[in-house]
Every structure is written in structure tokens, then in C-alpha cells.
């Protein structure tokens, strides 16, 4: 497909200056004016030469194919029809039929329920867009779709692009799909993509070569490149060696593997080496493959070749490679033990397999760190602004704000990074969380710890804990009402070392890991004393006793640090349980120093600690104190009730208008607010305050012409409010009598029968005393 005005412009070999300028501007501003890779008549691309091997990002795929997945004219039935044959996770966005917003429709698995399509409303606000029920907010719809392609959050499973869009390699193919619009869902292109098998990337096959070909290489060795990342090589030889783990397989019958004289590449040939004997071996004995690893060193005897490099010399991505010690032996020396030499090939084979699996995580971590350093990206701007804001000064609920920012940044990073990293969504979230801790919490750790220490020292928490630790050491197990004894000195020192590691760690997840290790050591010591039947009732006193002898008041800071910054999903698991146990134990120790106060039992202290923690997590109580529940009586629809948010100083007149709006009353002048109390309705004056009414009644919004005695409720209650004598009340209620009418028992019984289904229906009220003239006048007026 040619763009108008582009065919025939310039020679076939050289693009015109105008097309070059257009392509340059398009590369400068891809987000504002995307230029598609449409070929011109010469076979080139109108948008300028595209870099070979360039991967189209997920955001570009969504932007170019917006007419396919954004169907604002489609209704719910059309969405069901288009998604009925699609694989689970396929989605489209339509306009809601019942609400003024857009809806995200997603195909569900067959066994998920009666409906195979779920709809989620997309809410728009000044801060961005978000799904209904989710706390994640994004700047635009495309960013939201990108994020939910990698993380499901409230969805049943992550979103998935149609296969034709996902496998498109160039902008030209995506533009061709975009031109189809809604017809893409029923086109042959989509059907062909569905019927075809879901093939993964074609990996390069290892080809067995003859001994003559192998001898042409340096040191008669075969190089095996890691096929997981064939196109991710760096510009230098050292970078190539880092990115592609090379394994040299010996062609001799015996090859004890030991550290080489010089790290490869290249592999030097040792002087005086015995000539290769592979020419006398059949090719089938050259290399025996295993399906689990991919290579195996043949057994036998023969001269040794230059040894393999150790894992420490190869940057294979193992997280523990920098912490392990080197392989014993000097350079160029053979293995010191024949038994160790026989085991090394298998160990190195297993290590190579693990390194290949861990390499994607290192790549994701490096990519996430680069994005967080770049202010031009959404995640980078959020992270850098967060660092600047925290360093500027303390704020209320600072740790909770940091945790929310980390969750938002993780969703943005998940949307930025493509799915080609060979990581599952759950593993991707774990790697991104770890990268965020390194980029955000590591530099902020000293600042946050100093602020926590100042705050806890100012309110006396640290002082009370230090005094409680001293008393617990002096009193022993009797301070907690327990007969348990301390673990052995060796076990106590092991627990102390784990707690010291916890204090030196900046990541909350790593701190919880150290806490679990310490608690495991304590459980082992507890079972040694009490047997297998020991439980939480014995564990909490033992934990408090061990903490007292470790004498680490700084654990109070770390308990709050972990509780606020730990990922919310981890708080409900084993880590959250033992973190709560640590907080309860510290609270129990802090209470020992208070004079004339008996220490609570472990169970009571645990409940109190949980209550305090929930108070920090839940919103304040005053947020719910401005709510009033009003019942609505109507002859046609019966009785309904609603909870209304009323300002503190709102009057009854304001509440009347609010009720008329909420209950959709067509004639609000004929309705009024009444207080149902003592089997009677009392008309409320317009000037009374809504939040200062008697609490022993029910607010009812009903027709004002129903029978009632004249007057104001304030006279019966004796409050003496001046609003009862206002002009508006005199117009609404003629007379100065009682404002409430007492219903007869028969009428009350009839009313209870009409309102038996959950509401107060229309009440046919009679006079309390038939002989009273005011009641008879009211009945006559009603007739």
C-alpha cells in the first residue's frame, strides 16, 4: 500500500529529502505523530530506513491497532459475538450501554463460569483512568491496557492481544491490520492465526561436526551459545561472552575439567600438548547428548585439554556467584582429586542450566533500573519525584505513601517491559519489586530509619522497650508466665545473627525472610524442649525471652518499616503472621516497664497489637459519622431506604432537597421529612439541624398531606427551638398543637402488615382519641 504523493518521488535507490525529513521528525516524536512503515514504490520504507531487528513494543502495537480493539459503536451482544471464538484473555473496549463510561470486555476460559465474557467499567477522573474496583491509575487507556497485559490485578487473567497483532513484526503489517477495523475479527487473517499452532521461537539446532571440523577451532573445542537470547549480544567480545554462555565440550575420551590457564576467549593451546586423537574416533562417540541439559562429556581416559573456566569467571547471572569462593587450585593446574574431576562436568552442566534460567531475570532487572533512572518515562518520573519528595521532608503517613507509589511504579514498569523476557507474570512482579527496592528503598533507607527513630524516641516507645528488655532479662521466663528456658548459647547466637542481618537489610521482603529464618530456629529449639506439640502459646513467650537477651531495641523500627512497606499480598501469608508475632512480642516487652500494670497474656497482647495495626491500616472513624439513613414511603412502590452523606451543619430543608434528588421525586413540594417515634410521625421543621435530631427515632421521607397533627416536633420534645414558630412552619402546619399524631393499635397493625417485606409501607393512620376535635378535623381534611 502506497501513501499518496510518495510513489515515484525520487530515484529507486535514494529516498527524497522530504521523505527523509518526514522520517526524521517521526522518529523524534513517535508518540505525537507515529509514522507507519509503509513501503514506497522502490521497495523501501517511506518512514526512513528502520533499524534491522527492531522489536515493536506493546504500546506501539496498541496504538497502531486501535481501530481493532477500540469498538465504541459495539454493544454487549456484538462484543460477545466477536469474542466467542477467541482464546482466553482476548479483549476489546466498547461503550457501556447503561453508564456513561467505557467497558473492557475480556474472553474468559470455558470452565470459569456460565458467561465466557467479563466486563469491567473503565472510570475516568482528573488523575487518569482506572478499572472499577482497582486502586491502580494510569494516564491514558493505552497505558492501562499495557499494564493489564502483564499483570491481572482484579482480572481473572492477563489481557492478550490477538495472535495476528502479537506476531506482526513491522509497522506495515500492523497498519494493514488496523485498516480492517471491526472486520478484522471475522477476517481470514484472524481465523488463520487461530487455526495455526501456537509455535514458539525457532531455536538454533546443534549440528554435529566431524573431528576435522572440530580440530580447526582453537584448542579443539566446541562452543555452545545460549539459544535463549540469540540477538542480545553486545558490541565487544567480552560483552558477547557475558551474554552468551559458552560451554566447551572436550573431544577427547577423557577430559578432567579444571580452571583454565587464561580465561577465554580465546583458549590458548598449551605448549607440548599431545596431538588430537579425535580423527580415530567415530562421530557418534564424539558427543552424547542428554535431553535435560543438551550436552555431556564422554567418559574414558586420555590426555587432558585446556580446562573449562569456572563459574566465577563467567558472568552467567547466578545471584550467588559473587559470594562463593573460587575453585581451589592455581591457574593451569589439574584437578587435585580424580573424584572431584569426575563430578565437575555434571555440576557445571546443572549450573549452566540454572544460569540460562536466571539470565532473563537479570535482564529484566537491568531494564527496570534503566527505566527508573530515565525521567522521560512514566515510571522514571514517578520514582525520581518520589525520591525528591521524601528527601525534602517528612510527611504524615509517609511509609504508606511510599508503598502506594511502589505499587504504581511496578504496574508502569510491567507495562513498559515486553513479554519477550520469558518470565511468568508472577515472577515478573517479584523481579520488579526487587528492582524497586534497590532503586527506591536502598537510597532512602537511612533517611526513613532516622525519622522513625526520632519519632519513636519522641513518644517514648524506644525508652519503654529498652526498660522492658532490661526487666525481662532480670526476671527471666517468669516475666511472661512461662516455664520455658532459653535455647542453648549456640542457638541463641544463631538467632541473634539472623536478627542483625535483618537490621542491616533495606528490602522489606528480605527482612521478612531473615525473620522467618530466625523463627524457624526458635521453633526447632522449642520442639527440643516441648516436643512436637508445641504451638503459638509457647512460641510467643519464647520469642519475647530471646528478644530480651538479644537486646535489640531497633527491632521496633524494623517492625513498623516492614509492616508499612511490605507488599500487601505478603502480609496475608506466613511472613505476615510472624511479622505480627514480632510486633506483639515487642508490645509485650514494652508493657513490662509500666508501673502498676499487670502484663497481658500473650493472646490478649496479640489481639491488642492486631487492633492497633488495623487502626493504622483502616480509614479514620470520623469519615463515617456524617451519614444518615432515610426511609422513603410511596403508595406505588412501598418503602425503600438509602444512606445519605449529609454535611455537619446541614438543615432539614437541605436534607429535603437531597432526598428529593436521591429518591427522584417529581413533586418535592408535596413531600416532607418526618421523625417516626413512639408509633407516631412528627413533622420536622425546615430550620432544624439534621445531625441534632433525637436518636430514638427513624427518619421517613413521605407525602406531607398524610394525616398528622399540627405543630412542630420541637414543642413535643421540649427543646424550645425558635424554628417551630417560623413562618414556613406555620404555612406547612396550620395550628399550634402537637406535631405528631398517635396511631391506633389497629392502624399500626395494618401498617406493619403492609411493610412486612423490609420497609415501612404506606401507613393508614387514625386518631389517637376519636373524641378530639383536632383529630376529627384532620380526618375530614384528608377525606
Curated annotation (Swiss-Prot):
The modification Phosphoserine is found at residues 3, 16, 210, 258, 333, 337, 351, 609, 611. Residues 69-163 form the SH2 domain. Residues 456-598 form the VPS9 domain. Changing residue 351 to A: Abolishes phosphorylation by PKD and the interaction with 14-3-3 proteins. The keyword Lipoprotein does not apply. Residues 624-706 form the Ras-associating domain. Residues 257-269 have a biased composition (Pro residues). The modification N-acetylmethionine is found at residue 1. Interacts with the GTP-bound form of Ras proteins (NRAS, HRAS and KRAS). This interaction prevents the association between RAF1 and Ras. Interacts with 14-3-3 proteins YWHAB, YWHAE and YWHAZ when phosphorylated on Ser-351. Interacts with the SH3 domain of ABL1 and ABL2. Interacts with RAB5A. The interaction with Ras is probably regulated and antagonized by the interaction with 14-3-3 proteins. The interaction with 14-3-3 proteins is regulated by phosphorylation on Ser-351. This is Ras and Rab interactor 1. It comes from Homo sapiens. The lineage of its organism: Eukaryota, Metazoa, Chordata, Craniata, Vertebrata. The gene is RIN1.
Amino acid at each position: 500500500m502506497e501513501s499518496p504523493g510518495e510513489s515515484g518521488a525520487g530515484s529507486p535507490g535514494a529516498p527524497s529529502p522530504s521523505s527523509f525529513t518526514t522520517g526524521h521528525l517521526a522518529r523524534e516524536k513517535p508518540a505525537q505523530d507515529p509514522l507507519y512503515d509503509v513501503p514506497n514504490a522502490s521497495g523501501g520504507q517511506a518512514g526512513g530506513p528502520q533499524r534491522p531487528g527492531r522489536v515493536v513494543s506493546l504500546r506501539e502495537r496498541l496504538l497502531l491497532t486501535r481501530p481493532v480493539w477500540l469498538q465504541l459503536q459495539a454493544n454487549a451482544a456484538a462484543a460477545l459475538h466477536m469474542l466467542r471464538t477467541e482464546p482466553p484473555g482476548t479483549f476489546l473496549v466498547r461503550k457501556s450501554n447503561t453508564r456513561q463510561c467505557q467497558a473492557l470486555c475480556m474472553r474468559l476460559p470455558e470452565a470459569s463460569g456460565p458467561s465466557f465474557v467479563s466486563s469491567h467499567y473503565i472510570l475516568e477522573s482528573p488523575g487518569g483512568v482506572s478499572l472499577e474496583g482497582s486502586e491502580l491509575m494510569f494516564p491514558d487507556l493505552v497505558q492501562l491496557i499495557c499494564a493489564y497485559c502483564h499483570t491481572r490485578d482484579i482480572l481473572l487473567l492477563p489481557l492478550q492481544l490477538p495472535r495476528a497483532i502479537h506476531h506482526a513484526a513491522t509497522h506495515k503489517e500492523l497498519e494493514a491490520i488496523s485498516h480492517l477495523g471491526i472486520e478484522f475479527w471475522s477476517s481470514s487473517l484472524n481465523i488463520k492465526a487461530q487455526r495455526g499452532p501456537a509455535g514458539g521461537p525457532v531455536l538454533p539446532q546443534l549440528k554435529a561436526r566431524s573431528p576435522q571440523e572440530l580440530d580447526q577451532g582453537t584448542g579443539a573445542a566446541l562452543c555452545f551459545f545460549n539459544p535463549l537470547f540469540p540477538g542480545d549480544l553486545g558490541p565487544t567480545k567480552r560483552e558477547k561472552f557475558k551474554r552468551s554462555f559458552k560451554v566447551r565440550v572436550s573431544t577427547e575420551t577423557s577430559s578432567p575439567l579444571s580452571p583454565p590457564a587464561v580465561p577465554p576467549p580465546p583458549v590458548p593451546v598449551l605448549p607440548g600438548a599431545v596431538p588430537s586423537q579425535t580423527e580415530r574416533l567415530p562421530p557418534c562417540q564424539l558427543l552424547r547428548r542428554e535431553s535435560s541439559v543438551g550436552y555431556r562429556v564422554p567418559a574414558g581416559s586420555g590426555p587432558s585439554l585446556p580446562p573449562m573456566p569456572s563459574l566465577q569467571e563467567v558472568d552467567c547471572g547466578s545471584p550467588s556467584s559473587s559470594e562463593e569462593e573460587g575453585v581451589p587450585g592455581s591457574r593451569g593446574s589439574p584437578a587435585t582429586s580424580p573424584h572431584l574431576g569426575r563430578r565437575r562436568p555434571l555440576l557445571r552442566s546443572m549450573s549452566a542450566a540454572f544460569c540460562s534460567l536466571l539470565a532473563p531475570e537479570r535482564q529484566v532487572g537491568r531494564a527496570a533500573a534503566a527505566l527508573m533512572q530515565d525521567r522521560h518515562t512514566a515510571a522514571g518520573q514517578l520514582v525520581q519525584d518520589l525520591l525528591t519528595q521524601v528527601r525534602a521532608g517528612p510527611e504524615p503517613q509517609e511509609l504508606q505513601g511510599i508503598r502506594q507509589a511502589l505499587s504504581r511504579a511496578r504496574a508502569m514498569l510491567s507495562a513498559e517491559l515486553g513479554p519477550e523476557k520469558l518470565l511468568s507474570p508472577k515472577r515478573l512482579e517479584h523481579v520488579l519489586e526487587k528492582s524497586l527496592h534497590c532503586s527506591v528503598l536502598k537510597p532512602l533507607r537511612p533517611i526513613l530509619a532516622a525519622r522513625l527513630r526520632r519519632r519513636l524516641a519522641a513518644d517514648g516507645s524506644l525508652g519503654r522497650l529498652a526498660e522492658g528488655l532490661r526487666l525481662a532479662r532480670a526476671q527471666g521466663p517468669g516475666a511472661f508466665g512461662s516455664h520455658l528456658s532459653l535455647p542453648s548459647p549456640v542457638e541463641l547466637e544463631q538467632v541473634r545473627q539472623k536478627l542483625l542481618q535483618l537490621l542491616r537489610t533495606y528490602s522489606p521482603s528480605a527482612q521478612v525472610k531473615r525473620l522467618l529464618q530466625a523463627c524457624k530456629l526458635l521453633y526447632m529449639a522449642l520442639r527440643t524442649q516441648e516436643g512436637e506439640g508445641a504451638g503459638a502459646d509457647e512460641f510467643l513467650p519464647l520469642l519475647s525471652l530471646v528478644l530480651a537477651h538479644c537486646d535489640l531495641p531497633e527491632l521496633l523500627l524494623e517492625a513498623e518499616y516492614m509492616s508499612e512497606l511490605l507488599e500487601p499480598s505478603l502480609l496475608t501469608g506466613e511472613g505476615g503472621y510472624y511479622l505480627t508475632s514480632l510486633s506483639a512480642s515487642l508490645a509485650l516487652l514494652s508493657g513490662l516497664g509500666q508501673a502498676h500494670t499487670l502484663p497481658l497474656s500473650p493472646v490478649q497482647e496479640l489481639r491488642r497489637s492486631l487492633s492497633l495495626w488495623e487502626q493504622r491500616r483502616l480509614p479514620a472513624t470520623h469519615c463515617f459519622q456524617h451519614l444518615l439513613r432515610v426511609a422513603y414511603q410511596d403508595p406505588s412502590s412501598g418503602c425503600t431506604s438509602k444512606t445519605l452523606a449529609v454535611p455537619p451543619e446541614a438543615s432539614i430543608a437541605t436534607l429535603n432537597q437531597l432526598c428529593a434528588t436521591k429518591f427522584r421525586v417529581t413533586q418535592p413540594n408535596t413531600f416532607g421529612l418526618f421523625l417516626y417515634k413512639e408509633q407516631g410521625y412528627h413533622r420536622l421543621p425546615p430550620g432544624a439541624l439534621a445531625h441534632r435530631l433525637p436518636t430514638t427515632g427513624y427518619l421517613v421521607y413521605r407525602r406531607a398531606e398524610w394525616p398528622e397533627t399540627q405543630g412542630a416536633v420541637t414543642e413535643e420534645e421540649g427543646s424550645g427551638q425558635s424554628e417551630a414558630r417560623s413562618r414556613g412552619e406555620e404555612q406547612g402546619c396550620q395550628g399550634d398543637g402537637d406535631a405528631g399524631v398517635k396511631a391506633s393499635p389497629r392502624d399500626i397493625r395494618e401498617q406493619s402488615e403492609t411493610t412486612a417485606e423490609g420497609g415501612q409501607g404506606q401507613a393508614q393512620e387514625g386518631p389517637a382519641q376519636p373524641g378530639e376535635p383536632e383529630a376529627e378535623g384532620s380526618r375530614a381534611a384528608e377525606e
